[in-house]
Amino acid sequence: MTRYIIPSVALSAIYSAYRSYYYPDSTSAFGIRTIEEAVASLNANVNALEALHFIQQNKPDNSFMCSLSPTALGVLALRGSELCKHVPVTRCEIDEDDSTFSTILAKFNLGDEWDSGMAWLSRVACPEEDLACPEGWFARRPSQVLRLLQLLRLMFLKTEVPFDPAHIGIEVVPFLYLIYTQFRDTNKDLSILALKTLSNIALNGPPYAISIFTSDWLPLLSSLVVNGKSLEERLISHKICQNALNTLGVVNYQLRSDIYELFLPEKEPEVDIVMIHGLRGGVAYTWRQKDHSSNIVSDCWPKDWLPLDIPHPMRILGLDYPSYLMQFTGTLESLQVRADRFKRQLEAAGVGRRPVIFICHSLGGLLAKRLLLDLPELAKQTVGLLFIATPHRGSPIAAWGYSILHPTEDVLLLLEENPLNEDFFKISDKIPVIVSMVETKQSDLIGTAKGIIVPTQSAVYEKGAVYHIEEVHHNVCKPSERTSPSYAVVLNFLRDSIQEARKRKI
């Protein structure tokens, strides 16, 4: 393969060659002529777009809503249909006996940790003059909201795997609705965690999925998937709908806790694009448009721009994981632990059933290499790998990390003697398209210090084309507009990768 070193000033011309608009053809060979046919199509999830179009064009009264199955309601919610506002649903209300969150939480049985947390949540502080008070109970009672957050985190972790309905009953669905609606405007952590937990709950059997689609959650989710206050709200609401539809047999894959579906085309995807962020990044932050001004067009450019500029149906997924510079506890995961976790989740999401393209920033490139080493079948399906400022041979930040407190496993991976790069080199010939993007502007470090986070000699992989981008480390993956040099590289890379994927069909 010929290898090119291309300066960023030459890249803007690439943009116009790949720009096109993709409009899926939603027409049917049969045609829908009556509201009964539209309802039947929605219930069978056949020609759903045409059925929705028929209903919107003919504007029948809402009496047909009672004929829609939970599956049809889920499809409507997933598409953000306004029809969900008119569906009769079960109210998410608490029983008269459940006057507080603590009484509701007491119904769930999640083991000793849960019982201990419940006791702490409901404890009452002793007055100082009460000599019979147990030692350590003179302190003010802990914040109810803080304890509720901790208990909800525990529930989220416990529901990442299948659970016994006897331990977490169906009442968890209205409970999470109440948590979300009560704290949406006052505590983002609690409201987002309620949504994340519901996305796990949706996978635990038809009763939970049906409860979601026939309760107050239905109109709320249909609104959130389109008009959520944040990208996180929109992505998690989409995940809830997809997971519930998987449980009901409509969708043949699952979106586990670390996987987000950024874009899903109307047609069968030709490829899966997997985005992996880097150190201190996140799926809701790393892939946003560069926000140097107040005129922000996109909070997730892969989701908003790529479907407009790539004329092929593609599914776009994002992996999300915590990554830090410094370690204050012993609970952070190593690269191998994360890779093992992601292997299971990618398989559940159906990644590997079709050609795969990876787009990775910084540490995300190392994680992708670990995944491909551990999953030979996934490596065979990989047609493209874009390294964006990935430290293949270490970074000065690792040495800096040793000098402050306790560097994390993530920082230690940036050492030059890390053997991962050498191991991956042995299998990289199997990947037809490999591209490297290199940062060329210094980043702010500490105080007035500046420096290149990932120097050129480390960011350039041994194979494939190389592009130098005039940006700092954390912005090299954030194009400011669709004519940006960095975005042109992405389009060029995707075009080449999709061409390779199409060759495999012949």
Show where each model-derived region lies.
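Active-site-adjacent alpha-helix of alpha/beta-hydrolase-fold enzymes
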Residues: 407, 425, 440-472
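Flexible, membrane-associating and regulatory peripheral segments of lipid-active enzymes
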Residues: 2-305, 311-354
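Serine-dependent carboxylesterase/thioesterase catalytic core
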Residues: 277, 326, 336-429
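Short aromatic-enriched loop/helix-cap "lid" or pocket-rim segments at secondary-structure transitions
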Residues: 285-289, 329-331, 382, 394-401, ...
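Active-site loop/turn elements of alpha/beta-hydrolase fold enzymes
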Residues: 321-323, 390, 439
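Hydrophobic/aromatic beta-strand patches that form the interior of the parallel beta-sheet core
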Residues: 274, 317-319, 384-386, 433-438, ...
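Catalytic histidine-centered segment of alpha/beta-hydrolase-like enzymes
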Residues: 328, 473-480
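Post-His helix in hydrolase/transferase enzymes
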Residues: 478-494
